[in-house]
Amino acid sequence: MALLQKTRKINAMLQNAAGKPVNFKEMAETLRDVIDSNIFVVSRRGKLLGFSINQQIENDRMKKMLEERQFPEDYTKSLFNIPETSSNLDINSEYTAFPVENRDLFQAGLTTVVPIIGGGERLGTLILSRLQEKFEDDDLILAEYGATVVGMEILREKAEEIEEEARSKAVVQMAISSLSYSELEAIEHIFEELDGNEGLLVASKIADRVGITRSVIVNALRKLESAGVIESRSLGMKGTYIKVLNNKFLMELEKLKSH
């Protein structure tokens, strides 16, 4: 397969993934196919975001690492010493992707390390390994292009997380601001009583203890439920089961109480 065709294969993966959640496993598989090597996509903290094996390495420690999807902390930190692509590192390199305890089996093993950079910061590392065949210029072009694509996807995922956080917070703030003073007071007492994300509430008991009507509690819960912040379910004489759906709610409530 020519370089242009291989590049187009990476592009096709990008186009097919448009708008869908990031799938680093598929990315690793595509890079494995076009570069013909083992591929490991490693986050800043050593989490294995995706990997694909072209040539099996029989080693218990490696198997455990892949199962746990976590690279050793020391190795991950050392990768940050590589600011640009470092190719064809042998088994004696501290950056080798081969198990050094089986050095004799992997004498010809070669590793290439490509930093994943996006938005001016180091987001992770793309690691490629082969049992013997040297990584040529075309392989390195594809690896660096692949690392750029992975970096773009990591940034997109981060942006989506930030957006989701902001949306959750805004929904909670709107829901809380829709409550009257007495409803807000009722909600504060309810969640003091629950002491967590979910639990059983007997509205009449809280109403009697705090000195508010039961209807205030019911209205307050309805407002939060219609905003999608909580869900509630009547269990008859036992009371009402309440569960927090928006993880920003209790934090915002705590902030209000501390002011």
UniProtKB/Swiss-Prot annotation:
Q: Which InterPro entries match?
A: CodY (IPR014154), GAF-like_dom_sf (IPR029016), GTP_trans_reg_CodY_C (IPR013198), Transc_reg_CodY_N (IPR010312), WH-like_DNA-bd_sf (IPR036388), WH_DNA-bd_sf (IPR036390)
Q: Which residues carry this modification: Phosphoserine?
A: 215
Pfam family, any one: HTH_CodY
Q: What is its main location?
A: cytoplasm
Segment GAF domain: which positions?
Answer: 1-155
Localization: Cytoplasm
This protein's GO cellular component annotations are: cytoplasm
Query: SUPFAM superfamilies in the record, alphabetically?
Result: Winged helix' DNA-binding domain
GO MF annotation list: DNA binding; DNA-binding transcription factor activity; GTP binding
Q: Which GO terms describe its biological process?
A: negative regulation of DNA-templated transcription
Q: Which UniProt keywords apply?
A: Cytoplasm, DNA-binding, Phosphoprotein, Repressor, Transcription, Transcription regulation
* Highest taxon in the source lineage: Bacteria
Whether Glycoprotein counts among this entry's keywords is no
Q: Please list the residue ranges the record marks as binding DNA.
A: 203-222
Stated family? Belongs to the CodY family.
Which purpose does this protein serve, as stated in its record? DNA-binding global transcriptional regulator which is involved in the adaptive response to starvation and acts by directly or indirectly controlling the expression of numerous genes in response to nutrient availability. During rapid exponential growth, CodY is highly active and represses genes whose products allow adaptation to nutrient depletion.
How is this protein named in the record?
Answer: Global transcriptional regulator CodY
Annotated organism of origin: Bacillus licheniformis (strain ATCC 14580 / DSM 13 / JCM 2505 / CCUG 7422 / NBRC 12200 / NCIMB 9375 / NCTC 10341 / NRRL NRS-1264 / Gibson 46)
